[in-house]
């Protein structure tokens, strides 16, 4: 563009037009002036072709009185039409660019100086940065267009000039003496390559210092994926299976790689930091971070895989933000392909998201590329984040783990265990989840809607609400090697086959998923909303006197301090009255006053929503609630009786709620809870027997409300058992039992005024039946029909009798007895309007 008089004239005109808007300055002009030998020819080198950057350099040289890059310069007999060149050669007229080729100007300079020992030349690397460094920039709009490591197109460069051009900075680096390189006597070609290498390293180091490190592995990694042995084999198999050429199959693999891979940029991380800092301060009253010190220790020397619970679309943004603010590398995040949409998908990808399809079934090539991508992340030590629950929990419970990503991780580790892997559970507890209103329909029983990032925008109108605080608790890490040592002691010496799928993989992966879920629940953050929901949803009319509620909340806190759920569980500050005030301030509680005091209650909408927050901590209160349930039908029980019934029911509660204590620990933990009950006046211990308080006493009310925490769960168990016993041996399949349980639960929810759709959630019945099979209480015959052990009858008439009121048991048995004649009608008969009260 500038290598002829006419082109220089055009260039000068363009430069003047550019500077109608652009304002530039040189960062370190004094250091350049001190090191420059003005008696020697000067050549400027820019990293890549850019007319706008050349114009800025030319303007700064003119301003500083330096030789201009666009004017001719001579070195001995060599006459160059311009005193600059690009390290990456300019494209030809067809747009082709040989990135590995040497700049012609540099080659001619080396040749000339090699032949004329008396001559010399100086090369000055020059970098142009549009706008401030990401570290200094506070405008999210400007950060979107700030310099990055990504290849910049013409449109983006134009936008960068328009948005950032008023703060353009030019950095002249120390001159490189070309004669000193030639004196190494390495020959012309090697000297040129050495000069190129020095310049590449220089530009990379300078760019790192100014805009931050190059966090993206995308440019090189995707091309490398298709050359890995397992992917090459998958490409060959794809070509043979689809009757296409290997080249086409390889091109398809490359497309998959580009679809999957993240494109980390420091600029995007800074953009998200600026935007999210504003967002958190705008929405939340604060973010509490607990136990991050353990993560900072374990991050050194381990491949860290963060496994958070999934309650909101902002979970991954929040976690990446907190890790970055605490000096930890933000992870590469597994995101559903539905989030890979224009603008949003690009920003998420540059913030570390890699995208995965919902199913890999029927696409072995995609599976191979995805597995290889994750294997590369793991072995290179990039931190990774994925959600073992799969999708967001719409009910507030910990969902059953989806083990696909865990299986890929396990297989990768079996393939190469040089980089040890550690799973870090992260519990994110919201006092008010951002998408709460969008969950209301599903909490009322509507079918689950397809996930979309636009769910976030649907709640913009509700941002005037108070969202309280967020707690982020890091749980106990799980070291994968230690886990495998316990599960498969000889895993290191086993023959694993070419696909690294040992026979024990599925079972071990399932146990790993359960352990991750338990560790997540151990790190729960109990907040005021959880406790208020727990108390009010345990009442018949969803209402309590304010003082009675304060006593109930104080009881919850006292019990959890006396018998901590785990060292990683956190509790709120303040007493019961302070917690009530906090929840009232968030407009989640309604209040009515009379002469006797204040009555606190839940309106219809908040009653449904509060089931979500109760479910967050259901696992923490399940065992003490079960113990309290024993004393609803019995006024006195011995320790042996309590332990016998607890052992009968606990495995099913533990399996559904991922409770942390093993059966071996159960006796000790039960004793601790019973001691706490005695200390709080909920029970008395006399003559080796535990006695409940008088039914008219305040303590009996507290004990009763505590017992209601797991009432619906125990009722579901009893439903399934009653239907099985009334069906007889080998007469019903698991699928038929699920359907009947769902119909029966729907009917009972209408009869008893329950507005809690999880009461008739088919997946919960399915899991209970599966647990009965695992406990060998049930068995399947060859036709898939269920037979049961005598223990099932004992479970129904022994344990259930102790924990469920007689009227509830009678109602369930009556519906179960009429299942044959009434099941079909119950499924289709019109339902009366839902009652006003819900719990």
From Swiss-Prot:
State the similarity comment. Belongs to the GPAT/DAPAT family.
Write out the residue ranges of the motif HXXXXD motif: 309-314
As for subcellular location, the record says: Cell inner membrane
The record's comment about this protein's domains reads: The HXXXXD motif is essential for acyltransferase activity and may constitute the binding site for the phosphate moiety of the glycerol-3-phosphate.
What is a single molecular function from GO for this protein? glycerol-3-phosphate O-acyltransferase activity
Q: Per its record, how is this protein called by name?
A: Glycerol-3-phosphate acyltransferase
Query: Which Gene Ontology CC terms are recorded?
Result: plasma membrane
HAMAP family associated with the record: Glyc3P_acyltrans
Q: Which UniProt keywords apply?
A: Acyltransferase, Cell inner membrane, Cell membrane, Lipid biosynthesis, Lipid metabolism, Membrane, Phospholipid biosynthesis, Phospholipid metabolism, Transferase
Query: What enzyme class is recorded for this protein?
Result: transferase
Q: What pathway is this protein said to act in by its record? A: Phospholipid metabolism; CDP-diacylglycerol biosynthesis; CDP-diacylglycerol from sn-glycerol 3-phosphate: step 1/3
* Membrane-topology annotation of the record: Peripheral membrane protein
EC code(s) of this entry: 2.3.1.15
* Substrates-to-products reaction catalysed: sn-glycerol 3-phosphate + an acyl-CoA = a 1-acyl-sn-glycero-3-phosphate + CoA
Any one Gene Ontology biological process term? CDP-diacylglycerol biosynthetic process
